[in-house]
């Protein structure tokens, strides 16, 4: 850990880390919400129009995935694999005609980052400690805040799409479709089948959903969360 104690010092450490290493660093979207993004692939500067950002993911869930690999943070953070190579998009870039911009990331998220400037709780300090440790392990992280938006006049929060990896043996797509505070499924595609955890299980009594088709992939890529859910339920009922 760097020799810093206050939240402000830790925040500045992260900011300077981004600047010194030619990462995107902090940038402002809303007046009171600040985001930070670090690109693993920093050999070519990324265009600002291709911001890879997601909004308000469950920080504790992400953190638990990391910590469960080891009791010691350092060992755990060094072995993060679940959330590698992730790509996110801005809300206004989500449309039926938009194409995904893929890049490689490891990310850790929190909806508390916007409170760092004036919140002195130990929880915030711990979050920043973890973020700094990620950076010191050579991981580049994305910290994001709460944000919601609409598609087709339906409130859809935290839609994100990503490619985790694509090699000769397997294609693995993961995307989060959070349609409400009560409904937070995680879906992914592996070996040609759409798989899921959390709330989808109560609808389908299984974590393995119907084989994916072009329509499913299109809805995933276009962020059509509600349409996808309806389609999957109908497919399951056949």
Stretch-by-stretch model annotation:
Residues 1-29, 34-48:
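Active-site-proximal specificity loops/subdomain of glycosyltransferases
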Residues 12-16, 94-95, 204:
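Short, surface-exposed amphipathic charged segments that create phosphate/polyanion-binding patches used
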Residues 20-21, 72-73, 137, 182:
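Alpha-helix C-cap/termination motif
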Residues 32, 84, 148-149:
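Conserved beta-strand edge residues that scaffold enzyme active sites
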Residues 35-129, 136:
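Conserved catalytic core of nucleotide-sugar-dependent glycosyltransferases
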């Amino acid at each position: 850990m760097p020799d810093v104690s206050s939240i402000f010092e830790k925040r500045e450490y992260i900011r300077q880390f981004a600047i010194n290493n030619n990462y995107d660093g902090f940038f402002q979207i809303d007046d009171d919400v600040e985001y930070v993004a670090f690109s693993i692939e920093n050999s070519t500067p990324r265009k600002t129009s291709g911001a890879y950002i997601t909004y308000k993911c469950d920080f504790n869930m992400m953190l638990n995935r990391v910590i469960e690999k080891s009791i010691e943070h350092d060992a755990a953070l060094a072995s993060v694999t679940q959330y590698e190579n992730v790509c996110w998009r801005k809300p206004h870039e989500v449309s039926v005609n938009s194409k995904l911009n893929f890049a490689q990331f490891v990310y850790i998220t929190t909806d508390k980052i916007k409170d760092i400037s004036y919140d002195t709780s130990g929880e915030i300090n711990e979050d920043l400690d973890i973020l700094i440790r990620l950076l010191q392990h050579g991981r580049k992280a994305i910290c994001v805040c709460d944000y919601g938006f609409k598609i087709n006049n339906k409130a859809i929060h935290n839609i994100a799409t990503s490619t985790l990896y694509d090699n000769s043996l397997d294609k693995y797509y993961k995307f989060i479709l959070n349609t409400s505070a009560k409904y937070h499924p995680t879906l992914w595609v592996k070996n040609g089948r759409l798989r899921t955890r959390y709330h989808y299980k109560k609808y389908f009594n299984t974590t393995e959903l119907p084989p994916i088709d072009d329509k499913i992939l299109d809805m995933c890529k276009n962020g059509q969360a509600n349409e996808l859910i309806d389609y999957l339920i109908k497919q399951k009922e056949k």
